[in-house]
Amino acid sequence: MDSPTLEDRENSIEDCDDDDDNIYINEETEEGHEKVLVTHAPQERIVPPLNFCPVERYLYRSGQPSPVNFPFLLNLNLKTIVWLANEEPQDSLLEFCDTHKINLQFAAINPDAGEDDNPWDGLTEHSIINVLQTIVTKENYPLLVCCGMGRHRTGTVIGCLRRIMGWNLASVSEEYRRFTGSRGGRILVELLIEAFDTALVEIDKKNAPDWLLTSLE
């Protein structure tokens, strides 16, 4: 299965419509495309987090959000943020989640790591499964998966999700490397994704997102 293009994203915003003196956008809703009048520019800058990208409908990925990104995140109406690290995120993100009643889930990379271990390296199979169980449950949506830079740890989890969805390894690898920058991907990450046993993730079809059910048909 090839990687979908940006035009395929269900939650995309369509081109501007300038058929009169007003400015509109055609915004997709559950009932179809609804024309929304834009009356004024936003009062705050709308800046997405580093490496932000929609993954599927109401599922997003990024690096660690900072205060400049919070107005953007509010527009997503997030219910859950999954943090992929042993250490806590910045205090500003903790306060943001607390203020706006967003469930912040800590997915420790290695819960048994000692003080001398590098908290930025690798993901355990157990932690990946825990995150994926959150992702395949629609009651946690809208949902953001993030790590420090939004590259390797987030890429590992999303890569394993794509395996569940039936993507071929070439497409999974291409998506992972799209976010790794000039330094390129890590072969160990790609090997982990390839070896991941997708059967370890339990999917309740009554509580799974629609896009996941479609991919499993």
From Swiss-Prot:
GO terms for biological process: cellular response to oxidative stress. The active site is at 147 (phosphocysteine intermediate). The keyword Cell division does not apply. Putative tyrosine-protein phosphatase required for protection against superoxide stress. This is Putative tyrosine-protein phosphatase OCA1. Keywords: Cytoplasm, Hydrolase, Protein phosphatase, Stress response. The gene is OCA1. It holds the Pfam family Y_phosphatase2.
